[in-house]
Amino acid sequence: MTVTVKMLVDKLKLKVVYGNEELLAKAITTADISRPGLEMAGYFDYYSPERLQLVGMKEWTYLKTMTANNRYSVFANIFREETPAVIVARGLEIPEEMLQAAKENGVAVLQGRNSTSSLSGDMSWYLNSQLAERTSVHGVLVDIYGMGVLIQGDSGIGKSETALELVKRGHRLVADDRVDVYAKDEGTLWGEPAEILLHLLEIRGVGIIDVMSLYGASAVRDSSQVQLCICLEHFENDEVFDRLGNSNEEIELQGVKIPRIRIPVKTGRNVSVVIEAAAMNYRAKQMGYDATKTFKDRLTDLISKNGED
């Protein structure tokens, strides 16, 4: 996905101090952000001009100790054709020499009101999510108790209907039919809807419904961390399904492994309640409580007592 300077401005509500349409249309190619303190001191080894340049209180205070000519020389060296933009944090005053060098080198100058660390974190979060490589998977993503659950299964098995029931039970729809997944950082998988399908759910016999319009803003999310995969399968008498919770199945998406639970579907079974229970049980395991282990311990104790008798 291409991220432009204007997209960053709109997302973080930054002020454009200098920059025309052409400069704001520049592509940001990396999520890495540079704070050019060493460069201001004249050290340019390993300098990465393709990064966003963030000026905070430390850099700004150091600039104040320089003469006007030195300030201009610093920015003339920092600003390159491939530099997307420079952002000044805390609403600090923009030095005239910075503006002059930016105009001469074609670099947008932006200003943010937040602290430097807050602004840096917001930019990194946004850029990491937007620039990450994406994979589209078939399924429905629902946020259940703050945990993203990817529901998969054959076409027509009832994934969307199950998601609708979960929404009615107070959970939140993230994506239906197509889920775009990406690894935001090592070991963390996120999912979001395709833009054209945002907040929409397709129900056979009814058609497409807008979940946000029908159930309100609290019934949807734009993205969620995917932590569990539920696979709905047609119930077959000769098929063996896990009954004790011993299964350690996993699926791998974008290099991240997440647990996978197979749930049989048959007439009269309330699948949404089962999925809700599976999500809560998984969270309980993450917190250190394992009902399967508790059952095994009780069974072992019972066998030991019977053996003694």
Curated annotation (Swiss-Prot):
Residues 201-210 are annotated as: Important for the catalytic mechanism of both phosphorylation and dephosphorylation. GO terms for molecular function: ATP binding; magnesium ion binding; phosphorelay sensor kinase activity; protein serine/threonine kinase activity; protein serine/threonine/tyrosine kinase activity. It catalyses: [HPr protein]-L-serine + ATP = [HPr protein]-O-phospho-L-serine + ADP + H(+); [HPr protein]-O-phospho-L-serine + phosphate + H(+) = [HPr protein]-L-serine + diphosphate. Residues 264-269 are annotated as: Important for the catalytic mechanism of dephosphorylation. CDD domains: HprK_C (cd01918). It is an enzyme of class 2 (transferase). Its EC number is 2.7.11.-, 2.7.4.-. The Walker A ATP-binding motif also binds Pi and PPi. Both phosphorylation and phosphorolysis are carried out by the same active site and suggest a common mechanism for both reactions. Homohexamer. This is HPr kinase/phosphorylase.
